[in-house]
Amino acid sequence: GLSFFRKNYDMLKNKKLAILCVGASPFENQAFNEVKARNLKEDLKNIPTFYGRGTWDEEKMSFKDRTLCKLLQKAIANKDPKTYEPWMKALMDAMGKKCDWTDKKYLKPLLEYIGN
């Protein structure tokens, strides 16, 4: 993950690097850029970054992640659904279900980058 890049950046900086982020939320450019700005500082901010939707399976989540998601769902449930951001809607729609949003199309930009 990112900790590997941080620890080994000097050794990797002359290589062709890429970061693939995976999440349950549908892609939203503003949110993606905010996450990148928060997590990719200094040298890492210049590494090409890609996004693909993954899966949602509460049974496979750690206790900590499952608890945090449930707390977040409870907080969002108090809002008017008309005001939900895309990630909020996705989170609420997934509640109590197993979801799989994986699609090979998410890999296309990454594979094109690697191929160049």
Indicate residue ranges for each PLM-predicted region.
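FMN-binding flavodoxin-like domain, especially the glycine-rich phosphate-binding loop
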Residues: 1-116
